[in-house]
Amino acid sequence: MDPHELTLLEAAAALHTRQLGHLEYVQALLAQTDRLISLNAWISRDPEGLVLQAKALDKASSAPSEHLPLAGIPVAIKDNIDTSDLPTSGGTRSLLDARPQRNAPVVDVLLQAGALIAGKTNLHELALGGTTNNAVSGACRNPWNPLRIPGGSSGGSAVAVAARMVPAALGTDTGASVRLPAALCGVVGFRPSTGRYASPGILHLSPTKDTVGPMARCVADVAWLDGLLAKDRLHLPNVSLKGLRLGIPRGDFFEGADPQVLAVIEQALDTLVAEGVVCVTLDVPDLKQHNDATGSTLVMFEMMQSLPAYAKAQGLSMDALLAGVGSPDVARILSRQLGHERVTAAAYAAALARRQKLQAAYARHFADHRLDALIFPTCLMTAPLIGQDDRVHLSGRQVPTFQTLIRNTDPGSNAGLPGISLPAGLTAEGLPVGLELDGALGTDRHLLAVTAAIERVLPRLPRPPVVQA
């Protein structure tokens, strides 16, 4: 197997036993990155530094300690997570040269485990969107079809993993930003329960909603990283599918979806039923009602506290930050919030109250039906073409791009629930479809174990066309 095809845990084992050299591994990933540089997954990198670190590891007289389980493994970091050795730009012009004084704690956890920082990945400007069509850093391209978006806002992280440039990456997720690009790029992306990982050192939009999330090509890798970042168990227990209870929220989570997406999802559900899973159809209009009164209000209000504070820490005013914004959709959002459409404190307080009702509704559905997880399409559609930033065509209608892309992921985010997207299969057009599972608040390890069991019975995706070429 080519070194760049190894999963995170496979690569770690091969490096630890010296079946694979650190320099050989790093050079394989760098070659893959250089070959697919046109996908525009990266904003900043230090390939020479990676090579030097790999050479030093190879020269060591003994194999890395068990206390360095990720020794020599390059991991990609979304460019809104602070790193002291590389700039943290947020994908916006005013911060392109901003160098934080210290790493985000989540980055330090990786480094303390021996990981190498592969570079900082492209994102939707300031993480304020779902396409990663960034006018400052350039459009990021989907490895399954480079004319299409990878999703966002953590698009570069998903592309780097899917295109075998790295075995794993960190993104951030406010309403979709890890799970959406994971779904559209055919990888696994996990949003933990809010607060499970350390949150300092992030260019926040909404501290109430934001969380770092790991991405990889299999659930085992994501689960291992979750254990590391949360200081929890590193390996998952085996879970039997027989008797698992999964809630299917028909209605808003399925209505209006692309028929090709639905076909893949229904086939996956049929497979699970054949394996003994109990699927419970749910009627959950309360989730949409509470969510509609919560999400954007929370983000817009908190963003106008968080962004000025981050800019000030970098020696910038909010006006200077806004002047450097290149993406029209992001500029519009910020201009509105700086003007007469700014969310009021009263509206924010009302949204927080509705969030509590949303959380209570989720808890009630899980308890009443004794559910292990909810299961539904991560996204109602496959990856749209680059440039469809405002409206997309879906099931015979023109619909708003951002709201459509995040429709299924946003409610769980607002409730702070753990959620994971894994590949369910490919459409007839050869585009990935993501299957999302959301767990009850705080059930992260059980959700990951359930998802690992489901992954074992679903078809494994082939490599993306650009990787096969």
Regions found by a protein language model. Give the residues of each.
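Short helix-loop capping/hinge segments that flank enzyme active sites or metal/cofactor-binding pockets
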Residues: 70-90, 243-245, 301-363, 381, ...
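Residue-level signal for inorganic ion chemistry
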Residues: 29, 50, 222, 246, ...
